[in-house]
Amino acid sequence: MNKKRSIVSNHAPQAIGPYSQAIATSSRVYISGQIPLNPESLELAGPDIDVQITQVMKNLNAICRKAGGSLNSVVKFTVFMTNIEDFNTVNRIMQNFLEEPYPARSLVQVLALPKQADIEIDAIMEL
């Protein structure tokens, strides 16, 4: 039987609803979607996509580290964006946080995200 445990990092925003920052099983960590919130103020990091994607990646990294890994342990990202025109910017900034081989990734344009964020990313990390 797979036992699951909650992963909580104080260096990433606390959940803004009835869900965990992340759930770990014996071999994987499932990280809930992270929006660009400052972990201390729970305010949006800024209006620019560069600032927002950087904050999201920092939040994801904090959760990965708390779970015993890093962003390079991620095997799959799902990216939700409100403006597909920001695709190249997202690629450029994500590349700064990752090493090859890059994880698998899906990217979906959405109408809106919580707290008027322009980007949200969830992840699956291998332990």
Task: Enumerate the predicted regions with their spans.
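Short, polar/acidic, helix-capping and beta-turn segments at strand->helix junctions
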Residues: 2-127
